[in-house]
Amino acid sequence: MPNTYGSRTLTEWLTLVLGVVIILVGLFFVIAGADLAMLGGSVYYVICGIPLVAGGVFMLMGRTLGAFLYLGALAYTWVWSLWEVGFSPVDLLPRDFGPTLLGILVALTIPVLRRMETRRTLRGTV
């Protein structure tokens, strides 16, 4: 029998916590990235922060779209970092390690999000 807290399982609560973390990272990217872009820096952070915030919100709503938005932003991050520094592992590591680690956690939440979507659909609260 799974651990339950209220009507949610532990994995659902952890998924929601991950959604909050992604929202906070996305907000930081948008706010600090806008400042950086105004100073003439890369607009990557603003462009990447928007789907992070949206993805985190969708994860809080229990929708798989949130996970796929994050994974899309992760793919954009990989392309950007390759364009920025090439194939140098020393330069790629700080750009890709954290987002990829979060991406692995997000990918692991997809079955949980699907279960949450199915339960919501069965209740009729789309």
From Swiss-Prot:
Membrane-spanning ranges: 13-33, 41-61, 67-87, 92-112
Enzyme class (EC, first level): oxidoreductase
Catalytic activities: glycerol + A = dihydroxyacetone + AH2
Compartments in which it is found: Cell membrane
Membrane topology: Multi-pass membrane protein
Keyword flag Transmembrane: yes
GO molecular function annotations of the record: glycerol dehydrogenase (acceptor) activity
Keywords for this protein: Cell membrane, Membrane, Oxidoreductase, Transmembrane, Transmembrane helix
UniProt entry tagged with the keyword Signal: no
EC code: 1.1.99.22
Gene Ontology cellular-component terms listed: plasma membrane
Job description of the protein: Catalyzes the oxidation of glycerol to glycerone. Also acts, more slowly, on a number of other polyols including D-sorbitol, D-arabinitol, D-mannitol, meso-erythritol, adonitol and propylene glycol.
The protein's name in its UniProt record: Glycerol dehydrogenase small subunit
Organism in which the protein naturally occurs: Gluconobacter oxydans (strain 621H) (Gluconobacter suboxydans)
